[in-house]
Amino acid sequence: MSEQLLTASTPIDAAPLSDNTVQTTAPATSKINLLDLNRQQMREFFAEMGEKPFRADQVMKWMYHYCYDDFEQMTDINKGLRAKLQRVAEIRAPEVAEEQRSVDGTIKWAIKVGDQQVETVYIPEADRATLCVSSQVGCALECKFCSTAQQGFNRNLRVSEIIGQVWRAAKIIGSLKSTGTRPITNVVMMGMGEPLLNLNNVVPAMDIMMDDFGFGLSKRRVTLSTSGVVPALDKLGDMIDVALAISLHAPTDDIRDEIVPINRKYNIETFLAAVRRYLDKSKANGGRVTVEYVMLDHINDSTEQAHQLAECLKDTPCKINLIPWNPFPGAPYGRSSNSRVDRFSKVLMEYGFTTIVRKTRGDDIDAACGQLAGEVIDRTKRTLKKKMAGEPIAIKTV
């Protein structure tokens, strides 16, 4: 596959969605939103209109290579087909409600999805530009150090609301090309939500990201991060091949049970066994997984815990990202000191692990790891909060 740059209430132990179930909100119109369809589905849709498969490919190219949403702009499509598409279909990406820019070049967008918002983050670096994409409105997993989890859970995002984040960001970044803004080269499913609890919408969206007529990214440049929904991870390996990152954050079950509650259902040993099964199937990971480990002061950052982590991971090929914890209002944790992070990192490297201390990006606009909140109406009837404003607002039930 050629690679191009992109310019233009659920319980913790909820089972993965079945093959024929997609959680969505009702579309705003009766027209088909083409952003909900991967290439196979697009071809089926065009076949139903009596059109040949290459017409679907042409439209996809205009949609994703050029970020066009008006059929009249698609000049190699005959007028009759353009008129037919205008009647039965649309290209409708979620709109930006708010944009914030960090001093380090990071951009955070609050994206409107129905009457709520999710957050999408663009992170430029010297050799790449990564887009962090959300998969759910809120999150059901209740990880104690994560701002998103404190908002509760509302619903899964549709395919169009996931790939639409990439489409919208690519269109904005494309408009900034003259300023030297780097095109998107990588996408990470590390925004709001647990991607494996929305598998039937996340997988088609990632498929479009990697499709030559979509955004054309290589499978090594599309990463899914999970906290450990083991049955869905096994299912993922049979559905698609993408890079995998795991949110581990603790070397022992007693600590992980407290800060990542899904561990009470799928413990570390069970989780890592599933990771190894995925690696056996995957070519996207280069034989190893990325382990994410948020550093919490005097919670999981001692030298002894570094040794425990090395022992825990000895049978799992991996590289380790140590992530400075990013605070949010009301959180009971503190960020590990640089000296504790350095000692922790040195222990892991002595065991031979590739260990990287992640540089915090966008923390001045609450766009760093663990800070994404958006606006969530929680179906479990917790208090609705809009963290971007930093103030609680009235409860609204669904």
From Swiss-Prot:
Look up the record and name the cofactor or cofactors this protein needs.
Answer: [4Fe-4S] cluster
Q: Where is the Radical SAM core domain?
A: 125-364
Cofactor binding summary note = Binds 1 [4Fe-4S] cluster. The cluster is coordinated with 3 cysteines and an exchangeable S-adenosyl-L-methionine.
| Residues the entry annotates as binding S-adenosyl-L-methionine | G193, E194, S225, S247, L248, H249, N326
Catalytic activity from the UniProt record: adenosine(2503) in 23S rRNA + 2 reduced [2Fe-2S]-[ferredoxin] + 2 S-adenosyl-L-methionine = 2-methyladenosine(2503) in 23S rRNA + 5'-deoxyadenosine + L-methionine + 2 oxidized [2Fe-2S]-[ferredoxin] + S-adenosyl-L-homocysteine; adenosine(37) in tRNA + 2 reduced [2Fe-2S]-[ferredoxin] + 2 S-adenosyl-L-methionine = 2-methyladenosine(37) in tRNA + 5'-deoxyadenosine + L-methionine + 2 oxidized [2Fe-2S]-[ferredoxin] + S-adenosyl-L-homocysteine
Gene Ontology cellular-component terms for this entry are:
cytoplasm
InterPro entries, from UniProt? Answer: Aldolase_TIM, Methyltransferase_A, RlmN_N, RNA_MTrfase_RlmN, rRNA_lsu_MTrfase_RlmN/Cfr, rSAM
* GO BP: rRNA base methylation; tRNA methylation
Q: Which UniProt keywords apply?
A: 4Fe-4S, Cytoplasm, Disulfide bond, Iron, Iron-sulfur, Metal-binding, Methyltransferase, rRNA processing, S-adenosyl-L-methionine, Transferase, tRNA processing
SUPFAM superfamilies recorded = Radical SAM enzymes
Q: Where in the cell is it found?
A: Cytoplasm
EC primary class: transferase
The UniProt record lists the EC number as 2.1.1.192
Please indicate if the UniProt record lists 4Fe-4S as a keyword.
yes
Any one GO molecular function term: tRNA (adenine(37)-C2)-methyltransferase activity
**HAMAP family xrefs:** RNA_methyltr_RlmN
User: Which family does the similarity line name?
Assistant: Belongs to the radical SAM superfamily. RlmN family.
Relate the protein's function as given in its record: Specifically methylates position 2 of adenine 2503 in 23S rRNA and position 2 of adenine 37 in tRNAs. m2A2503 modification seems to play a crucial role in the proofreading step occurring at the peptidyl transferase center and thus would serve to optimize ribosomal fidelity.
Q: Other remarks? A: Reaction proceeds by a ping-pong mechanism involving intermediate methylation of a conserved cysteine residue.
What's this protein's name?
Dual-specificity RNA methyltransferase RlmN
